[in-house]
């Protein structure tokens, strides 16, 4: 059977149903296949046209979200309890019998190509693409960059084959959150638990890829008409299951993860090189990517990069003052509290823990890591994990002589 997880919380007569399919970019046989398979589910099924789906959901005050990640596809329905029989009927049809109609697919691909071309003229988009390709390489799903031609290679049969392989009852789980009634549980069990659906009942094989990092330290992508340059600095970092990860998160927040961070205080407030600079760890299935992000006037690119290294030096050599560390801790603990306030944000946390293969104690461990970390540990972690030599420098903008 399909695992069904229930989180009954909240006072409003609303529920959210998340159906997760194990099949994302990691599993696709060509670029964009996972994304468009998921995106096209609402564009017509055996029982409903795209217009009927949109109209009915609207009429019942329901909301459908489709998204896909490295290893999962998400189909999410928000519905009022009183209309759940009607909205679940549409939801079931979307999951079990999509048609991937050619006309609707053509329209969506055209609008995605337009968006891609608009993005391709933006320096931050170019810098980000260049960075992940430099860090992961062409053979890794993260480093494989979508090109305009890839959109033209998507057709209904490409999507149908991905759907047939991954969208089935042997490869999904359901999360039900909000004010959950016995009736809601019974309906979901009837629709999804009584008989298997889909064609292929194999679980996907767990795939792992080895990053092939470029040897270049600095990579420049030119946009001759750019008023500003985008700067991305990045390197491979810890994955979420690493024992040091939760404490490194505190270090990275202090470095560039909130408004009072070192990078903001120095490079924005003090030097005025940029309106905003940040650092964070982007999580992927088997690694993290530490990224420093900024946009700046072309003439400030070099001084900005120099100051980033200066802030790394300070973290590696000096102890963080107690009051500054207390401020970061308060910020992070407050942020965590806000993340677990509502039934739906709790469901998000819970899905995140399951899909990342983390222990159930993860939230408790995260709070503990923030509360207990010391200035000495911050300095040690900075020396171990903020490695200036491996940090790539990507600049996208106008060439300065």
PLM region spans:
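Charge-rich, well-structured scaffold segments of protease-associated domains
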Residues: 52-203, 239, 269-401
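His/Glu-rich zincin catalytic helix
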Residues: 1-55, 160-266, 305-309, 390-401
């Amino acid at each position: 059977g399909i695992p069904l997880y229930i989180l009954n919380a909240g006072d409003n007569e609303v529920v959210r149903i998340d159906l997760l399919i194990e099949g994302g970019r990691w599993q696709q046989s060509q670029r964009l296949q996972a994304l468009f398979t998921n995106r096209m589910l609402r564009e017509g099924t055996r029982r409903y046209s795209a217009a009927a789906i949109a109209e009915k959901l609207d009429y019942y005050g329901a909301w459908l979200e489709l998204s896909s990640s490295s290893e999962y596809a998400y189909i999410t329905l928000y519905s009022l309890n009183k209309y759940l029989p009607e909205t679940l009927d549409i939801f079931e049809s979307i999951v079990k019998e999509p048609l991937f109609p050619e006309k609707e697919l053509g329209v969506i691909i055209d609008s995605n190509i337009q968006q891609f071309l608009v993005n391709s003229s933006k320096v931050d988009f170019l810098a980000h693409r260049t960075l992940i390709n430099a860090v992961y390489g062409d053979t890794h799903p993260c480093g494989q960059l979508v090109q305009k031609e890839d959109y033209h290679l998507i057709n209904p049969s490409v999507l149908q084959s991905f759907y047939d392989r991954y969208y089935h009852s042997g490869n999904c789980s359901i999360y039900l959150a909000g004010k959950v009634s016995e009736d809601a549980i019974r309906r979901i069990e009837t629709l999804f638990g009584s008989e298997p659906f889909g064609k292929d009942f194999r679980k996907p094989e767990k795939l792992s890829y080895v990053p092939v990092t470029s040897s270049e330290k600095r990579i420049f992508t030119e946009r001759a008409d750019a008023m500003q340059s985008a700067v991305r600095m990045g390197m491979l970092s810890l994955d979420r299951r690493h024992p040091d990860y939760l404490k490194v998160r505190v270090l990275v927040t202090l470095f560039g993860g909130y408004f009072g961070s070192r990078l903001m205080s120095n490079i924005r407030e003090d030097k005025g090189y940029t309106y905003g600079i940040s650092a964070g760890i982007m999580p992927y299935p088997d690694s993290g990517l530490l990224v420093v992000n900024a946009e700046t006037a072309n003439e400030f690119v070099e001084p900005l990069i120099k100051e980033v290294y200066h802030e790394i030096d300070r973290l590696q050599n000096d102890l963080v003052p107690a009051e500054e560390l207390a401020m970061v801790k308060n910020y992070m603990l407050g942020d965590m509290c806000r993340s677990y306030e509502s039934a739906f944000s709790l469901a998000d946390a819970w899905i995140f823990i399951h899909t990342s293969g983390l222990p159930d104690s993860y939230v408790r461990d995260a709070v503990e890591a923030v509360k207990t970390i010391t200035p000495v540990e911050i300095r040690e972690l900075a020396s171990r994990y903020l490695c200036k030599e491996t940090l790539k420098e990507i600049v996208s903008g106008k060439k300065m002589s």
